[in-house]
Swiss-Prot record:
Primary role: Seems to be required for the assembly of the photosystem I complex.
Origin species: Guillardia theta
Listed transmembrane segments: 19-41, 61-83
Topological category with respect to the lipid bilayer: Multi-pass membrane protein
Coiled-coil ranges from the UniProt annotation: none
Subcellular location: Plastid, Chloroplast thylakoid membrane
Family annotation (HAMAP family): Ycf4
Family: Belongs to the Ycf4 family.
Main location (coarse class): plastid
Name this polypeptide is given: Photosystem I assembly protein Ycf4
Keyword set, alphabetical order: Chloroplast, Membrane, Photosynthesis, Plastid, Thylakoid, Transmembrane, Transmembrane helix
One GO term of the biological process aspect: photosynthesis
GO cellular component, one term: photosystem I
Length: 181
């Protein structure tokens, strides 16, 4: 292992929860659209649903509308997963005394984001912990001009011990202090 370079991979949209939501939305959307179409054509049954009991106006139209919206959200989520939005890496290079933060984006204009910082521009590592209904456990790189650059992935919160260990390892590697513990 190279002791002069440290690279942390960041998981983007290719998370299990995104795959699950994509499947749920697509399945539900197709079901709702089939129900709306079945009520329009007065089909008797598809998948154990009796469409003759559902009036096309207003119930069938609403079902088709919600089904279409669900399918569109599912397609958007598929695109996000395919392009791995938010994925990237954090690279800390002691030889060049440089930090690279790379992330993938959505559109062509901001498809890739690469931030480079010199070691001399870095003030500290900051840990932010918030335990509410939606817990927040993040590690930030704090620059001397007070910018806070998030280093952890977005999504499921990490364990408290993992956050602390990552922050301590990184602070020791960069020889800078930690704030917020």
């Amino acid at each position: 292992m190279n002791t002069k370079i440290r690279t942390d991979l960041i998981l983007g949209s290719k998370r299990f929860s995104n795959y699950a939501w994509c499947f749920i939305l697509m399945t539900g959307g197709i079901g709702f659209c089939l129900t709306g179409v079945g009520s329009y054509f007065n089909l008797h049954t598809i998948l154990f649903v009796k469409f003759s009991d559902i009036n096309f106006i207003p119930q069938g139209i609403v079902m088709m509308f919600y089904g279409t919206i669900a399918i569109l959200f599912s397609l958007f989520l598929m695109y996000s997963i395919f392009t791995d939005v938010g994925g990237g890496y954090n690279k800390y290079d002691k030889e060049k005394k440089e930090i690279e933060i790379f992330r993938l984006g959505y559109n062509k204009k901001n498809k890739q984001m690469l931030l480079k910082y010199n070691f001399r521009d870095i003030k500290s590592i900051k840990i932010e912990l918030k335990d509410d209904i939606n817990p927040k456990r993040e590690i930030y790189l704090v620059t001397k001009n007070k910018n806070q650059i998030p280093l952890t992935r977005i999504g499921e919160p990490l364990l408290l011990s993992d956050v602390e260990n990552q922050a301590i390892e990184l602070a020791n590697f960069l020889n800078i202090p930690i704030e917020g513990i």
